[in-house]
Design a protein with these regions (language model features):
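Short secondary-structure boundary/capping segments
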Residues: 7, 23-24, 44
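Short acidic-glycine-tyrosine-enriched beta hairpin
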Residues: 20-35
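Short, conserved beta-strand element in jelly-roll/cupin
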Residues: 2-17
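Ligand-binding loop in jelly-roll beta-barrel domains
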Residues: 27, 36-60
Length: 60
């Protein structure tokens, strides 16, 4: 976790995002925006390859 906010856009593949106690599956063209202070982990789903565009804002 860290202060700030994040935006993730899936360019290709499938991405799994663990956010707090929730899990989200994003496919190509999907996006998500969240508060980074909540525990989170972003990874390609099912051991496949994925490409994302990530934008991270930190208040520093």
């Amino acid at each position: 976790t860290h202060e700030g906010e994040e935006f993730i856009y899936v360019l290709s593949g499938v991405v799994e995002i663990n956010y707090g106690k929730n899990t989200y599956i994003l496919e190509e063209g999907d996006s998500i925006y969240y508060d980074s202070i909540v525990a989170h982990h972003v990874h390609a789903a099912a051991d496949n390859r994925a490409r994302i565009l990530g934008v991270v804002y930190t208040p520093y």
